[in-house]
Amino acid sequence: MKDKAYDITIIGGGPIGLFAAFYAGLRGVTVKIIESLSELGGQPAILYPEKMIYDIPAYPSLTGVELTENLIKQLSRFEDRTTICLKEEVLTFDKVKGGFSIRTNKAEHFSKAIIIACGNGAFAPRTLGLESEENFADHNLFYNVHQLDQFAGQKVVICGGGDSAVDWALALEDIAESVTVVHRRDAFRAHEHSVELLKASTVNLLTPYVPKALKGIGNLAEKLVIQKVKEDEVLELELDSLIVSFGFSTSNKNLKNWNLDYKRSSITVSPLFQTSQEGVFAIGDAAAYNGKVDLIATGFGEAPTAVNQAINYIYPDRDNRVVHSTSLID
């Protein structure tokens, strides 16, 4: 079945992509967001959800999660004209009659214009690399934590030895029934003070061990099998939830297949954020131009220009004068 034709497809559901989608809704066009991860929000939501951000206009400070929640709430005003596709990675797109055919790892989409807001490329969590892992993912196996309360009264196992793993273990100590940290080395990579707190806590530390297998029923993991490094000792850990904190990897390999002009790992754009292909625009960290400052605030400023230019491209005969939001929303 041929996909519905959208006015603008935004590649990337991070802060810049979300704001671009909102502004496109404000301008009355239909929008599709294609995001490679299983949730919206990009790096602030995934990599530093609880850390404070201080350079967002009108907010003295807010966390990555709060920023994401606000952007999603803002976009919800136009949910009737916005479609969101998660866990889809754009492989290629080609010019066709009336717009572009966009091929992802799951489907083919059609759009009249494209705005690329994928940051430094698609990024994905580093996994355990175990059979059946994907089956448990997003059920009771997590690569990121947003709501600590969801683990209340549970037996939680955390794999990893960096700052996030240690911070989550400490935060869950008084919430979960038990917390166990599994790390492949005796030494942790986290901040020294945090490691000292961890060692003085009630968190159970198992080092040096590596995950070997997952056991469960249906979509729920029940046991993690671990083996001591360079030894035959094997343990089975009962669990209610498993948190894998191995970090995230980024990749822009597909970006290089999009037949655009590039500057290092970013896309070269004009002052109006037009790429080397007519009808395709790029904003945020994905865009490269002289004097570029890689800040979220910068991307927010780029988004309206790119959206307006995309609308001018799609509807050249329409009266495309920009109107302030105070005149558009009661």
UniProtKB/Swiss-Prot annotation:
Binding site for FAD: 35, 43, 48, 90, 123, 285, 326
Cofactor(s), by name: FAD
Gene3D superfamilies, sorted: FAD/NAD(P)-binding domain (3.50.50.60)
Known EC number: 1.18.1.2
Enzyme class of the recorded protein, top EC level: oxidoreductase
Superkingdom as given in the UniProt entry: Bacteria
GO MF term list: ferredoxin-NADP+ reductase activity; flavin adenine dinucleotide binding; NADP binding
Catalytic activity: 2 reduced [2Fe-2S]-[ferredoxin] + NADP(+) + H(+) = 2 oxidized [2Fe-2S]-[ferredoxin] + NADPH
Pfam families, per the entry: Pyr_redox_2 (PF07992)
Quaternary structure (record): Homodimer.
The name this protein goes by in its record: Ferredoxin--NADP reductase
